[in-house]
Amino acid sequence: MSDKKVTITQVRSMIGCTKKQKATIKALGLRRPNNKVEKPDNPCTRGQIRVVQHLVKVEEQ
């Protein structure tokens, strides 16, 4: 197991997004713009980030 983490910041609103994108943002634990969460860096998290890459900013730690 790696201890790598990524910090995900929502930078754009979900207005006008598809249901899949809204569900992905909710699954990541984000609620509104400028909200941050820290998640483990694994393929599952990376896949979720790829779905909403235009709405979030990712920082690796």
Curated annotation (Swiss-Prot):
Keywords assigned by UniProt, alphabetized: Ribonucleoprotein, Ribosomal protein
Entry superkingdom: Bacteria
Alphabetical list of Gene3D superfamilies matching this protein: Ribosomal protein L30, ferredoxin-like fold domain
InterPro entries cross-referenced by the UniProt entry: Ribo_uL30_ferredoxin-like_sf (IPR036919), Ribosomal_uL30_bac-type (IPR005996), Ribosomal_uL30_ferredoxin-like (IPR016082)
Gene Ontology, cellular component aspect: cytosolic large ribosomal subunit
A single BP term in Gene Ontology: translation
Chain coiled-coil ranges: none
GO molecular function, one term: structural constituent of ribosome
Pfam families: Ribosomal_L30
Family: Belongs to the universal ribosomal protein uL30 family.
Subunit structure: Part of the 50S ribosomal subunit.
NCBIfam families listed in its UniProt record: rpmD_bact
Protein name in UniProt: Large ribosomal subunit protein uL30
Source species: Chlorobium phaeobacteroides (strain BS1)
Highest classification ranks of the organism: Bacteria, Pseudomonadati, Chlorobiota, Chlorobiia, Chlorobiales
Gene assigned in the entry: rpmD
